[in-house]
């Protein structure tokens, strides 16, 4: 089984949290709402990976004013690729508290939508199990 280390930002701006809706046809949680983030590349430092993933998935314009390591967790997930293949992966999630200075987002094709959500409205979204666990651990659900 392949192992992946995943950097995952919990991004907050003015009391709201950023959620991204995964594409319907790929990823670990197709069609569900999630936090952004992705895998650490070989030789890449953790914060470099976090900033690269944010740039790739959310665009160059989003400015983070604070990044603080928060917690980690692990589990085994099945990833679905765009061509329909599936793979079981051991995932190690490194989760960061992030504060953004703005809300300028330009999502890539991994996502179909995004939203800045008030804490009291987070439970209204179809959150994937990993995001639900993270938000509950944070006391937001």
Curated annotation (Swiss-Prot):
Chain ranges of the Nudix hydrolase domain:
1-141
Q: Which reaction does it catalyse?
A: a ribonucleoside 5'-triphosphate + H2O = a ribonucleoside 5'-phosphate + diphosphate + H(+); a 2'-deoxyribonucleoside 5'-triphosphate + H2O = a 2'-deoxyribonucleoside 5'-phosphate + diphosphate + H(+); dUTP + H2O = dUMP + diphosphate + H(+); dTTP + H2O = dTMP + diphosphate + H(+)
Q: Where are the transmembrane segments?
A: none
Keywords of this entry: Hydrolase, Magnesium
Which Gene3D superfamilies does its entry note?
A: Nucleoside Triphosphate Pyrophosphohydrolase (3.90.79.10)
Q: Does the keyword Protein transport apply?
A: no
Record motif Nudix box, residues: 38-59
Its required cofactor(s), as named, are: Mg(2+)
* Documented EC number(s): 3.6.1.9, 3.6.1.12, 3.6.1.-, 3.6.1.23
Uppermost EC category: hydrolase
Q: How does it assemble?
A: Monomer.
The UniProt family comment states: Belongs to the Nudix hydrolase family. NudI subfamily.
What is the name of this protein?
A: Nucleoside triphosphatase NudI
């Amino acid at each position: 089984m392949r192992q992946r280390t995943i950097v995952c930002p919990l991004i907050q701006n003015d009391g709201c949290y950023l959620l991204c809706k995964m594409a319907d046809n790929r990823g670990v949680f197709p069609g569900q709402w999630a936090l952004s983030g992705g895998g650490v590349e070989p030789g890449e430092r953790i914060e470099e990976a976090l900033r690269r993933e944010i740039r790739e998935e959310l665009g160059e314009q989003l400015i983070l004013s604070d990044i603080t390591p928060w917690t980690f967790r692990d589990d085994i997930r099945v990833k679905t690729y765009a061509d329909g293949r599936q793979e079981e992966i051991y995932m190690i999630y490194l989760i960061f508290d992030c504060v953004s200075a703005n809300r300028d987002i330009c999502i890539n094709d991994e996502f179909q939508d995004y939203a800045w959500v008030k804490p009291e409205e987070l439970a209204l979204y179809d959150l994937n199990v990993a995001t639900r666990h993270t938000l509950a651990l944070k006391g937001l659900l």
